Amino acid sequence: MKNTTSSLRRVRLPRTPADWLEAVMNFIFFLCGMLAVCCVVLISVYMVVSGVPAIHKIGIFKFLFSTKWASTAAEPLFGILPFILSSVYGTLGAAILGVPIGLLTAVFLSKAADPKLRTVVVTAIELLSGIPSVVFGLLGMQVLVPAAAKTFGKASGACLLSAIVVLSIMILPSIVSVSVTALNAVPPEYEQGSLALGATDTETWFKISIPAAKSGIAAGVVLGIGRAIGEAMAVMMVAGNSPNMPDSLFRSVTLLTTAIAKEMSYAGGLQRQALFSIALVLFVFIMLINVALNVVLKGGNRDE
């Protein structure tokens, strides 16, 4: 009985206006959290419901591993392996180009730049993150594509290489901003101890600061990869949009995102269902990237 009485005292009803306000705000916070959860659940259910029928009709093996896509032919073919490989190669290529540049930029901003120059570079990075995708695509189409064709002696510069270069530029803000935050969070005692033992600034940054900030840097890299694999408009303007296997950097290709974007406006029947199936595959890729991000962050927290 005594325990019950004490419990009732702890769970008291709101009495003052401040108590009522606190209760209302807590309820609003709860609703907002549940809204986010509901959005994820509804999107997931919708993607599965919309994407599974076409995979069932076409056959999962034929859909994922066939190399021919001819959705408007008399006898349509729905093989998305070229789209999957183009997305994977494009994303990996963008990471290979963008991650070293982004990481070195972050080290410079966090450790080496003077305040005035840091302000200028940070402002430029922030502006870069705010540029619309279509502007990146327009610049790539007008500058990068002709330059690639002229430099490598190709009839057209709209190819996988152009898409990789554009994506590598687009992922820089995510990598730089998150990596700078992670490097700034490294305890100064780590670096001071390294310098006191005779290490140079560069040795300290690469052997002490970067390893100590590895979980945050990894988070930035994964966020950048997520941006790259989900990009559509800019890539569609520079990649050529032909459903070819990406067997060369100079091959005109179609990515998962651009396949959906270029055909959805006129698609119908099984073709439209197949585009939803492509969206489901892309959704699974994004979910796997998010899972990888959580694993990396949890692993980094355990190490710390």
Feature roles, as predicted:
Residues 22, 101, 114-119, 187-188, ...:
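Amphipathic cytosolic juxtamembrane alpha-helices at the membrane-cytosol interface
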Residues 235-283:
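Interhelical loop and adjacent transmembrane-helix boundary motif
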Residues 180-184, 188, 195, 262-304:
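C-terminal transmembrane helix and the adjacent membrane-cytosol boundary/short C-terminal tail
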Residues 80-108:
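Transmembrane alpha-helix signature in integral membrane proteins
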Residues 1-33, 293-304:
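Transmembrane alpha-helical segments of polytopic membrane transport and secretion proteins
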Residues 101-140, 304:
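Cytoplasmic-entry segments and transmembrane alpha-helices of multi-pass inner-membrane transporters
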Residues 126-171:
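Generic hydrophobic transmembrane alpha-helix motif, especially the helices
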Residues 178-179, 201-237:
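Transmembrane alpha-helices
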